[in-house]
UniProtKB/Swiss-Prot annotation:
One of its GO terms (biological process) is detection of chemical stimulus involved in sensory perception of smell. This is Olfactory receptor 2T3. It comes from Homo sapiens (Human). Coiled coil: none annotated. The gene is OR2T3. Residues 1-30, 85-105, 164-200, 265-277 are extracellular. Residues 55-62, 126-144, 225-241, 298-318 are cytoplasmic. Odorant receptor. Belongs to the G-protein coupled receptor 1 family. Glycans are attached at residues 5, 10.
Amino acid sequence: MCSGNQTSQNQTASTDFTLTGLFAESKHAALLYTVTFLLFLMALTGNALLILLIHSEPRLHTPMYFFISQLALMDLMYLCVTVPKMLVGQVTGDDTISPSGCGIQMFFYLTLAGAEVFLLAAMAYDRYAAVCRPLHYPLLMNQRVCQLLVSACWVLGMVDGLLLTPITMSFPFCQSRKILSFFCETPALLKLSCSDVSLYKTLMYLCCILMLLAPIMVISSSYTLILHLIHRMNSAAGHRKALATCSSHMIIVLLLFGASFYTYMLPSSYHTAEQDMMVSAFYTIFTPVLNPLIYSLRNKDVTRALRSMMQSRMNQEK
């Protein structure tokens, strides 16, 4: 009986993957772990607070802030899908993940990545409607339209996850099962396959082009029209207001699309596994930290709502 159980456990262990993690073979693993843990807490707190502010402050019940709250929710889920497993594994010494766990992690990651790309396109269209079509804005971006746009973003993201995850996990992995990443990322996992994945890589490349092309076209068109309108404005105050409205969103767009292009569209010969891991860490850990800061520190409405919430809490304690 014991021998049978041990054999079963060994077979299970042999099918598990090993995640490299950010701290592998580092002389400063403790320092890196502490910094990562603090960034994780900052991102959780910042995004949760942003969602709470938007939902509790009536002045923030607008389409723009509705989309920002969805972006914050996606960032929270990004963090919870990838980072806790790495942090716990570093403490317990268990860096393994089962094939089913790997597939689940990959599905949620791809779903969130796809949904966020389309959400940024929806946010760009919202900024276009606000700046270029102010009189029609209440009709163009009413509550039903906003809910439909967000639902479409989630559905399209799920389609991405449902298409790529089963195919990736169906390949035989007969080389080393050590994934050179801190989570189950498609490019890192494909490097472990002993079968020919060149056709699938081409299909994945085309899928990424289609997934990024439509949002890029919407974002580019929206900001081209916005910049054209700004150029025609005679008011300096109008210039500043229009640019302030769009600048925060453009920063997030450049961060996310730059990282996505590097990871999924640049040929693997142009970057190493270590560089891939750093880029992955940037947009799964650092970007969720930056998003609340970009949207709060640069936004008077959010800072005003935060001060109002803090004052009301202090008055309640008195």
